[in-house]
A protein has these predicted regions:
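Amphipathic, charged alpha-helical segments and their helix-to-coil junctions
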Residues: 24-166
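Bacterial Sec-dependent N-terminal signal peptides
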Residues: 1-26
Length: 166
């Protein structure tokens, strides 16, 4: 009878452990940033952002050169001008500096907004692809492996790239 009890307890323990193991969540991982950078849409968006940035940079550099030229001219002519004229010129230069600073801030804001608007649909497409592949393969959780110290489980990168045809 004692052996039967031990056998029953061992069997119950085994069944419980097996149930626990099969009840474990299926976990996968993917480096989302690497996936996004591999997407052709990302490369197109980055090229557009860089082009816009260079346009702003060219305009800013031209304005800086104009300001420097005007400063040199006004400095060279300062001795021959009246105090009133020099004060007027200083106000003009200060106005130009303020305008340039405002333009730089607006350019930075426009670039950030453009980047957000271009990347948002790309990130959404990557998220949807990851979700579709994970669901198709029965995964309950997908972690971004860029933030993990140790990534065990299936890496979905190859499958998601195949899903996106990249």
């Amino acid at each position: 009878m004692k052996q039967f009890r031990i056998l029953a307890i061992a069997t119950a323990f085994f069944i419980g452990a097996t149930g626990f193991m099969t009840g474990q969540s299926k976990v996968a991982h993917i480096n989302k940033q690497e996936l996004i950078k591999a997407m052709p849409e990302y490369k197109t968006a980055q090229a557009e952002i860089e082009k816009l940035g260079k346009t702003y940079e060219t305009t800013i550099q031209t304005s800086i050169k104009e300001l420097e030229t005007k400063l040199k001219q006004y400095d060279a002519e300062a001795a021959s001008q009246t105090n009133e004229e020099n004060a007027k010129r200083m106000q003009e230069v200060e106005g130009m500096k303020q305008s340039l600073g405002q333009y730089q801030q607006q350019a930075q804001k426009d670039l950030q907004e453009k980047e957000f608007n271009l990347l948002k649909p790309i990130v959404e497409k990557a998220d949807n692809a990851i979700k579709a592949v994970a669901k198709e393969q029965g995964f309950q959780y997908v972690f971004d492996s860029a933030m993990l110290i140790m990534a065990e489980g299936k890496d979905l990168m190859t499958d998601v790239k195949a899903y996106l045809k990249i």
